[in-house]
Amino acid sequence: MPAKASLEGIEKVWSRVWEQNGTYRFDRSVTRSEVYSVDTPPPTVSGALHVGHVFSYTHSDAIARFQRMRGRAVFYPMGWDDNGLPTERRVQNYYGVRCDPSLPYDPGYTPPAEPPSRPQPISRRNFVELCRNLTELDEQAFEALWRHLGLSVDWSLTYATIDDRSRAISQRAFLRNLARGEAYLADAPTLWDVTFRTAVAQAELEDRERQGTYYRLAFHSATGDKIYVETTRPELLPACVALVAHPDDERYQHLLGSTAVSPLFGVPVPIRAHPLAQPDKGSGIAMICTFGDLTDVLWWRELALPTRPVMGRDGRLLPEPPPGIVNADAVAAYQTLAGLTAFSAKAKVVELLRAAGDLEIAPRPTTQTVKFYEKGDKPLEIITTRQWYVRNGGRDTELRSALVHRGRELTWSPEFMRSRYENWVEGLSGDWVISRQRFFGVPIPVWYPLDDSGEPDYAHPILPDDVALPVDPSSDAPTGYQESQRNQPGGFMADPDVMDTWATSSLTPEIAGGWTVDDDLFARVFPMDLRPQAHEIIRTWLFATVLRSHQEFNCLPWTTVLLSGWILDPDRKKMSKSKGNTVTPMALLEKYGSDAVRYWAVSGRPGTDTAFDTGQMKIGRRLAIKILNATTFVLRFGSPTLLAPHMAHVTEPLDRSMLARLASVVDSATTGFTQHDYTRSLECTEQFFWSFCDDYLELVKERAYGEPDDRAVRSAHAALALALHTLLRLFAPMLPFVTEEAWSWWQEGSVHRAAWPTGQELVGPDVSAEANRSTEASGSGEAGTDLLGLASDVLAAIRRAKSEAKQSMRAPVAQLTLRGRASDLAAFALVSRDVRAAGVVREVDTAEADTPLTPEITLG
């Protein structure tokens, strides 16, 4: 035990010891039933971790530590999600570069020392190398923070979603999806981000409100009558393929089945009926354009309409007019729009409509909900592209029902979050587009043969051999071809896309467990026990992982999901990097100590949003210091041998009452952890601990300083040792550093490898016959009386009297008179010695009364 107990530097000391001793090393020799496996969330490697990460990762770490102390071999890996758009954006901003796949690779390339004002174009391979270099630096910083926080991860079980093993597993899973018909290539309307120029999945959408304008424009019927349509996107007028009205709308029933002519472009379009048309929206009749929104896609598909694309992948109108625009005036009108952004094209169309007399009344402002890519800053467009899809139940009711059922098999913590999963699955409108038009990611493992004219045959893709995985089709030639045949007639071309980052992240149980790579390990850890994650990615990570496991193994990937809430800033808004209101955690860990920050984190229940609160961290630090001080006090009374924590030595009623209460705390804390309510475990343990320090230690102090051969003194020593031995283990999952420090002063090994306490340890069967006879002789009915509570109440009354009289707590009490029922007075007699010593009481008188026990204090 050090001369002066301190929290300073204990994180560095114990992190090093844990690593050297392999304290958290997974034992892969045990059977599956003895394993507790965690599908740890791999944090996105795109800058710094924030305090929200510390909050949620502490929760799962506390549970992993509890399970380890319960005797389970804990499989607790760590991954890095280091592929995808966030990483690309960080590299672009950090180095001041942009990827240009048309440029050749420069093996001697060195990025600018300072980011230039205009991004420097580099080859795809050079760009990927920069991504790898920067993510490796970020991963080192992430690992240092996690170690400082005290995550009990087995760092030998680390993976990155872009490493060779992860890429091979991701590509293998995709190819198996393809072989079973669960993955397919299709030309289809695609949600498209014009800034990043990539497809976006439904799960990555974000609704945002923005100001728009309704324009009322006139189509013309076959009889020459005007048909008024209101739209917020007049720039899509050249993409109009039909008008649509509700079949019961009497205003337009006479027009259904007829044809109207579009203004400016003179294109005949059919007038169709559909129940999704809204009579009370605008004029009640709407344009169907290819494509303005997802409703357009639905109408286009269900009404079997043609396609007239006008929007390019860059967010500008295509240079050539779509099919149907044929007469000279219409072509000329379109040419004034070609190459314009959607914003500029809208203004130009309005100008042309006004000049043609087809814009009716003044434009009307409106607030509309528009779909954005969650990481983008411009509204999404819908354009027709060729993409890879995985079937997810969006168009298959049988698969959708099976996935809903999977959600009901899963244990949700908290349970109410299950409805979010079900609502998402039930609301799917299409399959999962998994291809992305980006650069740093897992390549789609596909090539296409080229015919004699150099056209790709998409219907017969070339697939790699399994043993060749991972492959990069952009640099690897398929079996049977030479590199010289790339992009040549009769040769091959690579699929240029990479997979959505969720396509790889959805396989984290398989990647961490070594599916198809380490069959022995996989059999010991899969399906996993726990998936901890944030609730806002239920629709992405959780759902996609359930989907892939259902398709590959016909089972859930884990049995329980633990969902964390958000961290809220002082304005009660979610903390996030995109909002710029996050707090980086390292300064907090250094200022308050890791255990203090963990204390704040564990105070937030599963699924509950929690305020960022340094006040809670200060309380946590005081608690950690108090644990050291309490340990120091207990260890004053002898060596670890003399302080052997055995119930057989506990004979005094007050000591046994304290341990009985502690036994109840152990049971409550155990129940909390088994139900993933780590907050309950902390609360009940902390509440007991402060009572233990404030009341029991004061009550027992004088007796504990007595002669060691006195039975009552031995009882105090044994009770103190038992309580400390138990409390350090109860606090260990939440406060790993201070408990390990205190444990090391008097126990062998690590507290984190010690057995989790049980209530039975504290109430029997080791209670000696002598102790039992002592209790029976007292006739107190001790088992039904909270002697510690009774003694604490009397001591509190004594303290209060001294405080009100402005006297020292060591000032003597001339007389303590207790009035109450005979049973209460008899119970007090069992603890009278300790109360008198703690309160410095000279005389005690008792008087029976038919009232609760009431103390009267006469100060000396």
Swiss-Prot record:
Keywords: Aminoacyl-tRNA synthetase, ATP-binding, Cytoplasm, Ligase, Nucleotide-binding, Protein biosynthesis. This is Valine--tRNA ligase. The gene is valS. Monomer. It comes from Salinispora tropica (strain ATCC BAA-916 / DSM 44818 / JCM 13857 / NBRC 105044 / CNB-440). A motif ('KMSKS' region) lies at residues 574-578. PROSITE patterns: AA_TRNA_LIGASE_I. A motif ('HIGH' region) lies at residues 43-53. GO terms for cellular component: cytosol. Catalyzes the attachment of valine to tRNA(Val). As ValRS can inadvertently accommodate and process structurally similar amino acids such as threonine, to avoid such errors, it has a 'posttransfer' editing activity that hydrolyzes mischarged Thr-tRNA(Val) in a tRNA-dependent manner. The keyword Aminoacyl-tRNA synthetase applies. ATP binds at residue 577. One of its GO terms (molecular function) is ATP binding. HAMAP family: Val_tRNA_synth_type2 (MF_02005). GO terms for biological process: valyl-tRNA aminoacylation. Its EC number is 6.1.1.9. Belongs to the class-I aminoacyl-tRNA synthetase family. ValS type 2 subfamily. The lineage of its organism: Bacteria, Bacillati, Actinomycetota, Actinomycetes, Micromonosporales. InterPro entries: aa-tRNA-synth_I_CS, aa-tRNA-synth_Ia, Anticodon_Ia_Val, M/V/L/I-tRNA-synth_anticd-bd, Rossmann-like_a/b/a_fold, tRNAsynth_Ia_anticodon-bd, Val/Leu/Ile-tRNA-synth_edit, Valine-tRNA_ligase_type_2. Its main location: cytoplasm.
